[in-house]
């Protein structure tokens, strides 16, 4: 096994002993004797770091943010001077509110109440406007009934754009103007449908005010003809189950099915004049709009990012608002893989007499920051190298600086940098010569930032001025209590390293060893991959003391866990990512098997007890890994797995696999269809799935279990567990409690399992032999 020297951070001196990063002059603390318990780790970690997230306010005084006092009042505070002012008294705060947003001039608050969850990001609510000076509370709509889908303040005046019944409205000083009249079950104005919310925007809105507040760009989605998927809810949150389940019908486009069509619209707020802008970048049935961004400080120009259906070609189209003229200002062919929708376009303004916007692109093979001319032309690279920019944190147009996080040190790390788009000088804001994981949150005017150290040691947060990144102004979150708590425990020993594939690529590995690890003993091992395209599980972020830490710590279990990021995962360059294009489930299980064989070079690894467990894509990867019939893995658990990507949504799947018409053989191979690997397991295979899963439908588990049963996988090898009405997270009605107890029992039983096959009743042998042949007698 090849181990990278700089990454062999055996956190014996780190997490295991709760080292404080070198910012504080205190020595490492000693470990205790307590071991993590089930209740402390499951269903979610109870011993965990705290963090502070601030709602920065753009005002004349930089460093201001909104906080809430113990009695519920909303306070305007300055993080630097510690001065504060009560904006909303506690008795003016609506009871049971869900969220709130201040008007930009701080004269009013928009409240969301009566929250009802819809999908992953979207919800319905009532909205009220509080006039701070008058103390009056006014409903956004007089007849609202917890049915408003989204609402947003204009950046400049007293207007609110909101969506109700899939129609767009503009509220201004108590008067409401209905903008669209066609909203309904199939037409969405200003909010995304299910597939755009889940796979494209990752959010609940599809409208964008111009910086001067005079125009609104929005998208209209038409789901007419998109196939419907029906989800039954058997209990439907009732004490007594209804005789007929409630049925939720979702327009859910699966692979090669009809997608929703999308239109681009502009609204003049003052005149209420609405204009449909023709989108000609791709044909209507071959179009995905992935991003909208204003490319001006007023409302001169707005752009949208258009993809073809399978998202391997893109065009950035600029629209001149006054003339309504459209122009392709940038395009790219990414048919060597796919093009990620990073939602990173931001207007910069004038640079040496020409207007630019900033964006992230991996066209060079690595994701980097570029300046692009607003009217098209040659781009300017601001960062380069065989590492990746992860996210743009802040654009400071006055200082001509862009703040961002990157993997420059290593793909598992994150460090914060600035780059000048005037001089192209790149400057670290942290010590970028250590394996660490940072991010930052910048004040509205960019004068201050909260630096968040997120691992691998005990996290903390500090306030800095952008004028001096060497000396913190104050500590925001110390996590001293966590540090003291950890002194009581012996924690899993965590290390990071790389293993090298025969083809030359390296895979990142995170290893957890039991607290009382003895290299002369034998230990069962559980692999815990996710492994999906562009994802990352192996990082230097804080090691959550969750279920994986529990099974490592429990004296009756003492599992070693390995998390391996296979080919196709993120932050190691485009070539590494794109290797899985058109063949999901082919390379990923090969890499997991290779890693397991490398693991078995360790004398302490028990070859008879090597398991693999994954959720969602990880559940799919678990099944595909067992399907290889490698003989390395002896048991597996798939939670909420995809079993055949022809059953999953179009916009995610086709990005990586293309359509069935273009890649029929690829889809056939990607589906879990070979059963010998499951039949030959020394141990057991468990499938868990929620029947109310609106993302990865229960259909996947049903099809998978049927495939395995009909293929001859015997009852001593296979268990299927459904969770009534639970969604993809399996959280309905205490389901997660049962789920994790089942997981704990599974890994315990598998550790206790003897290598030889358990005895069977004679009638079982005869029945199995009749059904599946003499193999059942073996």
Swiss-Prot record:
Residues 1-18 form the signal peptide. It catalyses: Release of an N-terminal dipeptide, Xaa-Yaa-|-Zaa-, from a polypeptide, preferentially when Yaa is Pro, provided Zaa is neither Pro nor hydroxyproline. Its EC number is 3.4.14.5. It is an enzyme of class 3 (hydrolase). It is found in: Secreted. This is Probable dipeptidyl peptidase 4. Keywords: Aminopeptidase, Glycoprotein, Hydrolase, Protease, Secreted, Serine protease, Signal, Virulence. One of its GO terms (biological process) is proteolysis. Glycans are attached at residues 84, 114, 222. The active site is at residues 616, 693, 728.
């Amino acid at each position: 096994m090849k181990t990278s020297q700089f990454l062999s951070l055996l956190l014996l001196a780190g997490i295991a002993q709760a080292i404080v990063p070198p910012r504080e002059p205190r020595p490492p603390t000693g470990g205790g004797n307590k071991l993590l318990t089930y209740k402390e780790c499951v269903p979610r970690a109870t011993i965990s770091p705290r963090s502070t997230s601030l709602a920065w306010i753009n005002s004349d005084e930089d460093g201001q943010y909104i906080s809430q006092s113990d009695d519920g009042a909303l306070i305007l505070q300055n993080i630097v001077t510690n001065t504060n002012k009560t904006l909303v008294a506690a008795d003016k705060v609506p009871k049971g509110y869900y969220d709130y947003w201040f008007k930009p001039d701080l004269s009013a608050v928009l409240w969301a109440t009566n929250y009802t969850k819809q999908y992953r990001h979207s919800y319905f609510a009532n909205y009220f406007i509080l006039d701070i000076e008058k103390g009056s509370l006014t409903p956004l709509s007089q007849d609202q009934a917890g049915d408003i889908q989204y609402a947003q303040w204009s950046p400049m005046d007293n207007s609110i754009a909101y969506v109700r019944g899939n129609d767009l409205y503009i509220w201004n000083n108590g008067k409401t103007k209905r903008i669209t009249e066609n909203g309904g079950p199939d037409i969405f104005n200003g909010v995304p449908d299910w597939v755009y919310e889940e796979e494209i925007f990752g959010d609940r809105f599809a409208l964008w005010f111009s910086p001067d507040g005079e125009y609104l760009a929005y998208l209209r989605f038409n789901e007419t003809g998109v196939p419907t998927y029906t989800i039954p809810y058997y209990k439907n949150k009732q004490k007594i189950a209804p005789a007929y389940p409630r049925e939720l019908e979702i327009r859910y486009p699966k692979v090669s099915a009809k997608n929703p069509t999308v239109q681009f619209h502009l609204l003049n707020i003052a005149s209420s004049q609405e204009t449909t802008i023709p989108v000609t970048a791709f044909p209507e049935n071959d179009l995905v709009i992935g991003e909208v961004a204003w490319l001006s400080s007023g409302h001169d120009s707005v752009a949208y990012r258009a993809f073809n259906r399978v998202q391997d070609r893109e065009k950035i189209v600029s629209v001149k608002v006054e003339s309504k003229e459209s122009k392709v200002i940038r395009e790219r062919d990414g048919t060597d893989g796919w093009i990620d929708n990073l939602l990173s376009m931001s207007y910069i303004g004038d640079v040496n007499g020409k207007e630019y916007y900033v964006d992230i692109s991996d066209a060079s093979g690595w994701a980097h920051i570029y300046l692009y001319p607003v009217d098209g032309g040659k781009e300017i690279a601001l960062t380069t190298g065989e590492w990746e920019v992860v996210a743009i944190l802040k654009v400071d147009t006055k200082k001509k600086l862009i703040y961002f996080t990157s993997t420059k040190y290593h793909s598992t790390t994150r460090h914060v940098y600035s780059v000048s788009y005037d001089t192209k000088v790149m400057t670290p804001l942290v010590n970028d010569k250590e394996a660490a994981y940072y991010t930052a949150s910048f004040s509205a005017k960019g004068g201050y930032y909260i630096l968040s150290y997120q691992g691998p040691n005990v996290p903390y947060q500090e306030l800095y001025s952008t004028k001096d990144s060497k000396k913190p102004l104050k500590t925001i979150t110390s996590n001293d209590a966590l540090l003291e708590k950890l002194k009581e425990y012996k924690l899993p020993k965590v290390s990071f390293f790389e293993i090298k594939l025969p083809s030359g690529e390296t895979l990142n590995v995170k290893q957890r060893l039991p607290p009382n690890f003895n290299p002369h003993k034998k230990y069962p091992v559980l692999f815990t991959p996710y492994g999906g395209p562009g994802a990352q599980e192996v990082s230097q972020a804080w090691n959550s003391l969750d279920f994986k830490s529990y099974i490592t710590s429990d004296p009756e279990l003492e599992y070693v866990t390995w998390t391996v990021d296979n080919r196709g995962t993120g932050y190691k360059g485009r070539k590494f990512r794109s290797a899985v294009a058109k063949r999901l489930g082919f390379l990923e299980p090969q890499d997991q098997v290779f890693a397991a064989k490398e693991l078995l070079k360790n004398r302490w690894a028990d070859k008879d007890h090597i398991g693999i467990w994954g959720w969602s894509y990880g559940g799919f990867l678990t099944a595909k890994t067992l399907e290889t019939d490698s003989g390395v893995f002896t048991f597996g658990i798939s939670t909420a797995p995809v079993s055949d990507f022809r059953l999953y949504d179009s916009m995610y799947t086709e990005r990586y696999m293309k359509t069935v018409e273009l890649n029929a053989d690829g889809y056939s191979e990607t589906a879990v269809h070979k059963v010998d690997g499951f039949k030959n397991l020394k141990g057991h295979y468990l499938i868990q799935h929620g029947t109310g899963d609106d993302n990865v439908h229960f259909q996947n588990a049903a099809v998978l279990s049927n495939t395995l049963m009909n293929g001859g996988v015997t009852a001593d090898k296979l268990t299927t567990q459904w969770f009534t009405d639970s969604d993809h997270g399996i959280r309905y009605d205490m389901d997660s409690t049962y789920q994790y107890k089942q997981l704990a029992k599974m890994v315990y039983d598998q550790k206790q399992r003897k290598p030889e096959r358990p005895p069977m009743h004679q009638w079982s042998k005869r029945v199995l032999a009749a059904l599946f042949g003499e193999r059942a007698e073996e």
